[in-house]
C-alpha cells in the first residue's frame, strides 16, 4: 500500500533549515473553510477545548484566532492575509482548495509565518501538509462497495466537497476502485458537503429525477 496520496506534491520542504525568530507564547490563526458538518465541528472543539488549554498551560500558546470563509476561496485568501497582518505567528488551514491559496501562503511565508494544512493538502511548496492518503481510503470504499453488490449494479457516488483536496482525492479513489469491476456502472454523482442532512436531501432529489 502506498501511504502517500498520488495527487499530493512531494518535494524537499522549504522549512528544512527554517528557524523562527519568534519566541513563545505564540498566537496561531486558524483560517477555517467550513464548520457546517460533524467532523469539522469536532475538529474545532478539539482544537479550542483540548489542544488550546494544553498549549497555554505549557506556555507555548497565547491565543488561537479563528476565521470562517464558508467555502469561499477569495474570502479565505483575504482572511489569511489579514491574520498575517494582525501579527499571528503561524496559520492552520484544513481541507482547502489545493491551488487557490498558494499566493496567500507565499504572502505569509515571506513574512515569517508558516502555514500548516492539517488534513488535505495544498500545492504550494511553502506550506506544510499533514494528510492521510485519501485516494487509498476512497479506493478501499469503492472496492468494498463493488464487492458488497456482487461486482454488478448501478452505483450513485456521494462525494464530499468538490474542489477541495481531501474530497477530490477520495472521490478519485472511489471511482478508481469501482472501475476495477466491469459489471459496475456509476449512474450519477452528487455532493453532500460531508453533512448527513445534505446527503439525504441530495440523494432524495437525485432518486426523484432518476426513477428505476
Regions found by a protein language model. Name each.
Residues 1-212:
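A residue-level marker of the well-folded mature domains of exported/periplasmic proteins
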Amino acid at each position: 500500500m502506498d501511504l502517500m496520496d498520488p495527487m499530493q506534491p512531494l518535494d524537499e520542504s522549504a522549512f528544512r533549515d527554517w528557524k523562527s525568530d519568534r519566541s513563545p507564547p505564540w498566537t496561531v490563526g486558524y483560517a477555517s473553510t467550513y464548520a457546517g458538518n460533524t467532523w469539522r465541528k469536532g475538529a474545532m472543539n478539539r482544537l479550542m477545548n483540548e489542544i488550546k488549554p494544553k498549549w497555554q498551560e505549557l506556555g507555548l500558546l497565547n491565543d488561537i484566532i479563528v476565521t470562517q470563509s464558508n467555502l469561499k476561496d477569495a474570502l479565505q485568501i483575504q482572511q489569511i492575509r489579514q491574520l498575517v497582518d494582525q501579527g499571528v505567528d503561524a496559520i492552520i488551514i484544513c481541507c482547502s482548495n489545493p491551488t487557490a491559496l498558494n499566493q496567500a501562503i507565499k504572502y505569509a511565508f515571506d513574512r515569517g509565518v508558516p502555514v500548516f494544512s492539517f488534513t488535505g493538502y495544498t500545492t504550494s511548496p511553502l506550506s506544510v501538509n499533514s494528510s492521510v492518503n485519501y485516494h487509498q481510503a476512497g479506493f478501499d470504499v469503492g472496492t468494498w462497495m463493488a464487492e458488497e453488490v456482487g461486482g454488478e449494479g448501478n452505483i450513485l457516488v456521494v462525494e464530499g466537497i468538490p474542489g477541495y483536496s481531501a474530497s477530490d482525492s477520495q472521490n478519485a479513489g472511489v471511482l478508481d476502485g469501482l472501475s476495477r469491476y466491469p459489471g459496475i456502472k456509476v449512474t450519477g454523482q452528487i455532493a453532500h458537503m460531508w453533512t448527513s442532512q445534505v446527503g439525504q436531501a441530495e440523494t432524495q432529489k437525485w432518486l426523484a429525477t432518476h426513477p428505476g
